[in-house]
Structures are given as structure tokens and as C-alpha cells.
């Protein structure tokens, strides 16, 4: 059978349909991971296997209605995303289709099949300012910043020469207003001229090149005391939040998006509930951050990739790659980006389903054998880097992946594969959540491997903090050991020192680690407040121990200390109610 060409594109024919997986013959010359258009409605698909002239395609849209013999169009390019002004503050689906634009055009609640809308608005006018250090005749190489566009009040969008390009500037647009279709740069390389607009495309599976990877040494401040004080991450780190249903993974992810010290947020809802994305869309525009002397909505530094659980399964993989590629683009501008993937378990389930339809050999719990490799290739795109091109700049991507192990079982293949890759583990505990202790991060099983990297930062700014942190961990661990004895013989039979340990551990648990996300004073805790709260609690612990040991024949007891220092203890416990907006002198 001969291969047909339609509009210069090669045309294959469907020979088998199995859910989101389609087999097509006559696909000679097609490439792995090439983007194809399937059926008469031109559904978006991607080639994931080639055998002779037969290609196996995963389709990113609902495949009902496809029939044997329908055409398959090869586009000749891989699945790519559009990168340019207009990304921030927008909401896309897993294959970067703008949901608001689709809603306007279709007047439908759901995305119509085969809809083809450009990711970025071609008609919108942007204010372009050329770089001061470049002029016609200057050489320009990959990654060089040749213009700036004020994308939002929070982000100046730097227009960079795409990777793999270089030459001499023939034309550089003067300051003014341009659309994404207008030429703003023309270069000449060996007699060949190329024109560039403010937008370019990049394949999602290919990491964007960098000059070098750097050691991360600045903390990612989340505003959550338990994370910042006990298990900190760095800007450019990898974190996992595994937890059973109802433990608060999404709330922690959203809190990081709202309050962390990142320049930009990419929030990928990968196979999660639709109402959670609706909550994000409702909450984020109302939340503000102070920039100079004005308040700005945090939506202006946030990009949402919504891929809810009722959307096609295959698109979950695309949504993860779309999110990380856009994050890399903003990182290349010299920004610190946080990417939330909620949840990677849903992506793994999609891999399992497609792997099953391809009749691949299943590994643990039916997941494919390459699950760990796929997770690693995703998490390894995080990190702090020295960006390509001039001027010299550094950027970072922090990946926070939520994991939903069935029944909260951390030996689940997705969780164990993730823990082998990430450096920070914020383990959520169902029992803490049932006790209404939020964030329900279990302080006995969680860990951070970035403490060594962050020591110079703490030594310079909060010299005593590391001692307080170590002491707090010891108190919480000792409390866990003592609880077994207490359950057997009761509190009264313990030594006074142990009673003090239990009292201070309770104080740390209830008044320091627990945090109310729904109050003005406690939804965000600046790091200095965390340090001062911890300092006061540890000082009380040390002074109480000295009073008990040094009381001689009088035998000063915890009960007497509580009686004499009741007001002080009450003040220490009530520090969380103090609003940080009133200044640090309160503490």
C-alpha cells in the first residue's frame, strides 16, 4: 500500500484502536516521539513505538469514534510547547491548549475534540524593549537576552535567542509595541538569514541546555514552620510529599505556591480532582503579595497546567513534561521557579495503563519496569544552574512532587522509586491528620539531605538556629521513646527531667509544628518568627532543666515551675497567634 501525502505531510492509516493507544500502518519515515494528528478530527497523538512501518501512538484526547482506515497525519516535529510572553497567569491543559480561549470559542464546559488553538495569543500587543548592550552588527549566541517584555507586574520576561542558534545581528526592533507574530530580531550566519519573533517552540522531552549545574545553597522558604525549621529544601532541590488520601498533600502544595520565596510557580494538577484546580483558580487571584508599595495578585507569577482525572489518561504524562519545560524556560531567564506536580502517582498509573495496553512485561504491582527511570529523568531536570548566554545569570527549578500511595503504604513502587531520587522527604501521617494536626508531616520519618548545604546560610544569618533545631529534634525523639513508658506506668512515675521533656515536646508539637492555614496570622510564618519561637521554647527547656537539677534539697518540680511561670509558658505557647505583619520585636 502506498503512503499518501496530504498538505505535504505523510499520511498513515489506523489499523487498531485500544483505548488511548492507536496502531497505524504505512508510517515509513516517522520518528519516535513525533507528533501526529489522528483521525478525521485530527486528534493530537505521539508515536511511542515503531515496528517496521507500523507505529504505536498514544492519543492525548478521547478516542471514541475512531475507525479502522482513518488517516494519521505525520507533522514531522516532536511534541513541543510554545515559549514566549503570555504564559504567566494563564491556564493550560496537558498539551498546552489555553483553556480560557477554548471556553470562549466553544461555549462548552468540556474541551471539544480536535480543537486547535495556539497556546499564546497572537493578537495581544506586548511592550518590547531591546537590550541596551546589543546593536546591529554585534555577534549573538544561544541564550543571549536581546529584549525585555514586562509580562506581569511581578515578572519581566526576558526574550532570549533559542538554543542551537547564533550569528550576527542584521536587525533589532526598536522599543515599541509588537505582537508575537512580528519580527523583532534578524540574524545572519554564514550568509543565511533567520528571523525571530518573541515566541519559539521547544520539544517537551528534551531538557533545555545550560552552561553548568551549580551547588544549591539558598533555602526554599515555604512559610510552613515544620518544613522551614526541621526539613528545609533548597532553591533547586527535589522534594516528595507522600501521604494517604486526606492528609493534606494538596494544601501543602498550594501553600508552597502561595507563599514560597520563588520568583515563579508552575502548578501541574496531574490527574487530580477537578474541584482542587477550581479551588486554585478561585483562591490564587484573591491572594496578594506586596511589591514595592502596591499589592499584586500571586496569579501573576503562577502558571497552571490543569489535567484533571476525567481528562484522557495519556495527557498526564504530557502535562508533567509541559510543566517542566516551561519551568526550564523561566529558569533560563535567571529566575527561581518552583514546580508542583500533584500527583506523580496519577502519572505512574497512566504509564501502567498504557504499558498494559502495549502488552509490555509488568514489574512490581503491574507498573512498567522503566517507572524508576522515567521518574528519575523528570526529577533530574531540577537544580540550580548557570544559564546559557549573556549576561551571566543563575536560575533554579525546585520540584515538589506529591505522591498518593494506596492506603498510605510507603513501600508502594512509586513512593520507593521516588525516595531513591529526591533529597527531601516530607512524609504525611494519616494519624496526625485524623487528630487534626496540620500540616500532618511526621517529624520522626521525614528527612532533608540539604542541611549540610544550608549550614553556611544559617551560620551567617541565624548563628544559633542549628543548635535549636538539633535540640528540638532530640526532644521530639526522646518524647517518642518515653511515650511507651508513660503508657505502661503513667506520667507520675517519670523523673522531673523527663516530665519537662514531655511538656516541652507537647509545646513544640502543638504550638510550633501545627499551623492553621486559614488564619491571617498563621497561614504564613516568616523564617525569623520560626527561629524566635524555637529559641524561646528551647530556652525554657534548658532553664527548667537547670532549675530542677540545681534545686538541692528543695526538689523544685515541674508542677512548681508551671505554677510560678504560668504566664510565661502561656506567652510562649501563644507566640503563634502574633501577626508577623506587626514586626519581629513582638517575639
Curated annotation (Swiss-Prot):
MF term (GO), any: ATP binding
Signal peptide feature range: none
Role played: Catalytic subunit of the peripheral V1 complex of vacuolar ATPase. V-ATPase vacuolar ATPase is responsible for acidifying a variety of intracellular compartments in eukaryotic cells.
HAMAP family, alphabetized: ATP_synth_A_arch
Protein's recorded name: V-type proton ATPase catalytic subunit A
Biological process, per Gene Ontology: ATP metabolic process
Gene Ontology CC: proton-transporting V-type ATPase, V1 domain
Gene3D superfamilies linked: 2.40.30.20, 2.40.50.100, Bovine Mitochondrial F1-atpase, Atp Synthase Beta Chain, Chain D, domain 3, P-loop containing nucleotide triphosphate hydrolases
EC number: 7.1.2.2
Subunit structure: V-ATPase is a heteromultimeric enzyme composed of a peripheral catalytic V1 complex (main components: subunits A, B, C, D, E, and F) attached to an integral membrane V0 proton pore complex (main component: the proteolipid protein).
NCBIfam families linked to this entry: PRK04192.1, V-ATPase_V1_A
Record-linked PANTHER family: H(+)-TRANSPORTING TWO-SECTOR ATPASE (PTHR43607:SF1), V-TYPE PROTON ATPASE CATALYTIC SUBUNIT A (PTHR43607)
Record field: catalytic activity: ATP + H2O + 4 H(+)(in) = ADP + phosphate + 5 H(+)(out)
Family recorded in the similarity comment: Belongs to the ATPase alpha/beta chains family.
Residues that, per the record, bind ATP: 243-250
Pfam annotation, one family: ATP-synt_ab_N
Gene source species: Cyanidium caldarium (Red alga)
UniProt keyword terms in alphabetical order: ATP-binding, Hydrogen ion transport, Ion transport, Nucleotide-binding, Translocase, Transport
Amino acid at each position: 500500500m502506498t503512503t499518501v501525502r496530504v498538505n505535504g505531510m505523510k499520511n498513515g492509516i489506523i489499523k487498531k484502536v485500544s483505548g488511548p493507544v492507536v496502531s497505524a500502518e504505512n508510517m515509513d519515515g516517522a520518528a519516535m516521539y513525533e507528533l501526529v494528528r489522528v483521525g478525521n478530527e485530527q486528534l493530537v497523538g505521539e508515536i511511542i513505538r515503531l515496528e517496521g512501518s507500523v507505529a504505536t501512538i498514544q492519543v492525548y484526547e478521547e478516542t471514541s469514534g475512531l475507525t479502522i482506515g482513518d488517516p494519521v497525519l505525520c507533522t514531522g516535529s516532536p511534541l513541543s510547547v510554545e515559549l514566549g510572553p503570555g504564559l504567566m497567569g494563564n491556564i493550560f491543559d496537558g498539551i498546552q491548549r489555553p483553556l480560557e480561549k477554548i471556553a470562549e470559542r466553544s461555549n462548552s464546559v468540556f474541551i471539544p475534540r480536535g480543537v486547535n488553538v495556539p497556546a499564546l495569543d497572537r493578537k495581544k500587543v506586548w511592550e518590547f524593549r531591546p537590550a541596551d548592550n546589543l546593536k546591529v552588527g554585534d555577534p549573538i549566541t544561544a541564550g543571549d537576552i536581546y529584549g525585555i517584555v514586562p509580562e506581569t507586574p511581578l515578572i519581566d520576561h526576558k526574550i532570549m535567542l533559542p538554543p542551537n542558534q547564533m550569528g550576527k545581528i542584521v536587525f533589532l526592533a526598536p522599543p515599541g509595541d509588537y505582537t508575537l507574530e512580528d519580527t523583532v530580531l534578524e540574524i545572519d550566519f554564514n550568509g543565511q538569514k533567520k528571523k525571530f519573533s518573541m515566541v519559539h517552540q521547544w520539544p517537551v522531552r528534551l531538557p533545555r541546555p545550560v552552561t553548568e549545574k551549580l551547588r544549591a545553597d539558598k533555602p526554599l522558604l515555604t512559610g510552613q514552620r515544620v518544613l522551614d525549621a526541621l526539613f528545609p529544601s533548597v532553591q533547586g532541590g527535589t522534594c516528595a510529599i507522600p501521604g494517604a488520601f486526606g492528609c493534606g498533600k494538596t494544601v501543602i502544595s498550594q501553600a508552597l505556591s502561595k507563599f514560597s520565596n520563588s520568583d515563579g510557580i508552575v502548578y501541574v494538577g496531574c490527574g487530580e480532582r477537578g474541584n482542587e484546580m477550581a479551588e486554585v483558580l478561585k483562591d490564587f487571584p484573591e491572594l496578594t503579595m506586596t511589591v514595592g508599595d502596591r499589592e499584586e495578585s500571586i496569579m501573576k507569577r503562577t502558571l497552571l497546567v490543569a489535567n484533571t482525572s476525567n481528562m484522557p489518561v495519556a495527557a498526564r504524562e504530557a502535562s508533567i513534561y509541559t510543566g517542566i519545560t516551561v519551568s526550564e524556560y523561566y529558569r533560563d531567564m535567571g529566575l527561581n521557579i518552583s514546580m508542583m506536580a500533584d500527583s506523580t502517582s496519577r502519572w505512574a498509573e497512566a504509564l501502567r495503563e498504557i504499558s498494559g495496553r502495549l502488552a509490555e512485561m509488568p514489574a512490581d504491582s503491574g507498573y512498567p519496569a522503566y517507572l524508576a527511570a522515567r521518574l528519575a529523568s523528570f526529577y533530574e531536570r531540577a537544580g540550580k544552574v548557570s544559564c546559557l548566554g549573556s549576561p551571566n545569570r543563575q536560575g533554579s527549578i525546585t520540584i515538589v512532587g506529591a505522591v498518593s500511595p494506596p492506603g498510605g503504604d510507603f513501600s508502594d513502587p512509586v513512593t520507593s522509586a521516588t525516595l531513591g531520587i529526591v533529597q527531601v522527604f516530607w512524609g504525611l501521617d494519616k494519624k496526625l491528620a485524623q487528630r487534626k494536626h496540620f500540616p500532618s508531616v511526621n517529624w520522626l520519618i521525614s528527612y532533608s539531605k540539604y542541611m549540610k548545604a544550608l549550614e553556611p546560610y544559617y551560620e551567617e544569618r541565624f548563628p544559633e538556629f542549628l543548635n535549636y533545631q538539633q535540640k528540638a529534634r532530640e526532644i521530639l525523639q526522646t518524647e517518642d521513646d518515653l511515650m511507651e513508658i508513660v503508657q505502661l506506668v503513667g506520667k507520675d512515675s517519670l523523673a522531673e527531667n523527663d516530665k519537662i521533656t514531655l511538656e516541652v515536646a507537647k509545646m513544640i508539637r502543638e504550638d510550633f509544628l501545627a499551623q492553621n492555614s486559614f488564619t491571617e496570622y498563621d497561614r504564613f510564618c516568616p523564617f525569623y518568627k520560626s527561629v524566635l519561637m524555637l529559641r524561646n521554647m528551647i530556652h525554657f527547656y534548658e532553664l527548667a532543666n537547670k532549675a530542677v537539677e540545681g534545686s538541692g534539697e528543695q526538689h523544685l518540680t515541674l508542677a512548681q515551675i508551671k505554677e510560678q511561670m504560668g504566664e510565661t509558658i502561656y506567652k510562649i505557647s501563644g507566640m503563634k497567634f502574633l501577626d508577623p505583619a506587626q514586626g519581629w520585636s513582638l517575639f
